[in-house]
Amino acid sequence: MKNDDSSTVLSTEHKAMQEDLARATRAGGETEKAAWQVTRVLFPHVYREEEFAMPPLLLLPRLARGEVTPDMESILTKTEIMKAELPRMLAEHKAIVTALRKLLQAATAEGHAGFASFAQKLIQHAQMEEEILYPASILVGEYLKLKLGKT
């Protein structure tokens, strides 16, 4: 199974997020401090997302077309890791959202509307991951196990 996740929408979104956050770490004041805290909790989490949450999602278009091939079995390792790591990923989201709320508050107080908007969008992004992407990633594995006759 060949997937190049370097050009996925989610990877592109993560790169843009990192660039915006890097700008916020140079904003000065409480906004800068809050942005650094977001950075500390966010980047290890994003790495794990891109390592085992996102690759299964790349199969969704093929699976939606009814394509299931034996080489897709290789993704099951990642979906099992995702299933095991889900509680940790959700706990990390709580820490990330807490840090983002501090960034939102600081940026608003200091007149950095762009960074405040960025923080709000990231909070919504985390919610979307929890409600849609993480479950979908796990479901890819469960679906493949059924279709490939794996238990």
Task: Identify the meaning behind each predicted range.
Residues M1-T151:
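Small-residue-biased structural context
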